[in-house]
Regions:
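A short, hydrophobic beta-strand/beta-hairpin element that forms part of a small beta-sheet core
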Residues: 249, 353-367
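A non-transmembrane, solvent-exposed segment enriched in polar/low-complexity residues
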Residues: 21-172
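N-terminal targeting signals for export/organelle localization
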Residues: 91, 103-104, 110-113, 117, ...
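Bacterial Sec-dependent N-terminal signal peptides
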Residues: 1-25
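Conserved helix-turn-beta segment immediately C-terminal to the redox Cys motif
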Residues: 283-307, 380-386
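Short, internal strand/loop/helix patches
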Residues: 317-353
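N-terminal "domain-start" segment that seeds a small globular fold
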Residues: 229-261, 331, 377-387, 392-394
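Conserved redox-active cysteine motifs that mediate thiol-disulfide chemistry
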Residues: 265-266, 273-290, 311
Length: 394
């Protein structure tokens, strides 16, 4: 009896320890585990995605008789993020949020994993409720079209008048659906799901001013979350002009460390997009070296941030070394995505060179400057005589 009691106590301690480590347990059940090729799915993968949608497998699980389990440890300070369970046909997957607790994933068929139902943790329960908005809207459209068919006949639906009426019904429900989404997200503005959905699903339908109001509606403590930062950058990128705040882009340095543009708040920043394969960019290196020498004692006031769009990191590094550009305090970053990178797109960079001057509050002073304007503007900064037209209220 005593041994059994001790074993029970140790079992309880072990279970408690698992949850004390912030583990996300995902229990999946697939009713019909047959893929399109007729074979049963054997393995699934838990994948994360970067800002470009590139997936990384973080865990895998065997599927036995339609069941699988992931036990994924979540660090105590990790934000709640969306992952995807993959391994199904045509790169389809099950989107869910990884957070401490147990998530139940019920999938009717392996051929359509997107229709899976989630339950068990706060964000996933809320996400399932949010997805119901789409389901309800689709059902309303289907019922309305069916009512038209019963009233006028199915052949009438194929007529010009019938098709126009179906389009009217679909457009009406689409507007109602977007309104329901906005209302839902505002009502649940403290969920990490909210800024993600605001950016991906809602913002494309909003004006710049409305998108900015949506951004401001997010719960203040959530504003350090990566999804909020991404949403905020997307909103700011829509309206870049002199006097407006610019996006807070990430810059990967040569040593692999990532810094943010806003890490230099309180200083004037020269943001310099360039490429070693661009002749004019290389000509500007000499101007910027002279500028660096003239301002290196003023790095508490002014900093140069150069973001290379070279696709070849080695070529970029060689260019820095061969041209004496690896200098203390001159931030040199690289983005191998070129003009397709998020940073380039958010700043509207179509080609290099592209230089932007930013004030200590993170607002644009000058956009797409030539080298001579850069020199003039920096002289104004050092002399305390900088001026620019504030267009943010126009």
């Amino acid at each position: 009896m005593r041994h059994r009691l001790i074993a029970t106590i140790f079992s309880f301690i072990a279970c408690f320890a698992v949850y004390a480590q912030d583990v996300c347990v995902i229990n999946g059940k697939i009713a019909d585990d047959k893929l399109a090729n007729g074979k049963a799915i054997k393995k699934v993968f838990l994948t994360s995605a970067d800002e470009y949608g590139r997936r990384t497998v973080v865990a895998e699980a065997k599927v036995k008789k339609g069941s699988y389990t992931f036990k994924y440890k979540v660090s105590a300070d990790a934000p709640v993020m969306q992952y995807t369970i993959t391994g199904f046909d045509n790169e389809k997957g099950i989107k869910l949020f990884v957070e401490p607790g147990t998530v139940a994933v019920n999938t009717a068929t392996a051929q359509n994993p997107c229709q899976s139902k989630l339950s068990g943790t706060p964000t996933n329960d809320l996400y399932e409720e949010y997805k119901q908005i789409d389901i309800n809207a689709d059902e309303k459209v289907a019922k309305a079209v069916e009512a038209l068919a019963q009233q006028n006949g199915k052949e009438w639906l194929e007529s010009k008048e019938g098709k126009q009426e179906v389009k009217r019904i679909e457009a009406t429900e689409r507007i109602k659906r977007e309104a329901d989404r906005i209302r839902f997200l505002i009502d649940h503005n403290a969920s990490p799901m909210t800024p993600l959905e605001m950016e991906c699903r809602v913002m494309p339908y909003l004006s710049n001013a409305y998108a900015e109001q949506m951004m401001k509606s997010v719960y203040t403590p959530l504003q350090k979350h990566p999804y909020y930062q991404s949403f905020r950058n997307a909103v700011l990128a829509r309206n870049i002009k002199v006097g407006n705040e610019v996006p807070d882009i990430a810059i990967t340095l040569r040593d692999g460390k990532t810094v943010k543009l806003n890490d230099n708040r309180g200083k004037y920043i020269l943001l310099d997009f360039w490429a070693s394969t661009c002749e004019k960019s290389m000509q500007n290196r000499n101007t910027l070296k002279e500028l660096y020498q003239a301002t290196k004692e003023e790095q508490d006031k002014f900093v140069i941030v150069s973001l290379s769009l070279d696709s070849d990191k080695n070529a970029w590094g060689d260019t820095l070394d061969n041209n004496g550009l690896a200098l203390d305090g001159w931030l040199q970053g690289n983005n191998t995505m070129g003009t397709e990178s998020i940073a380039a797109k958010q700043f509207g960079v179509k080609k290099t060179p592209h230089m932007i001057l930013i004030d200590p509050e993170g607002r644009a002073i000058s956009l797409n400057m030539e080298a001579d304007e850069v020199q003039m503007r920096v002289e104004q900064i050092l002399e305390g005589d900088l001026y620019y037209l504030d267009q943010s209220k126009e």
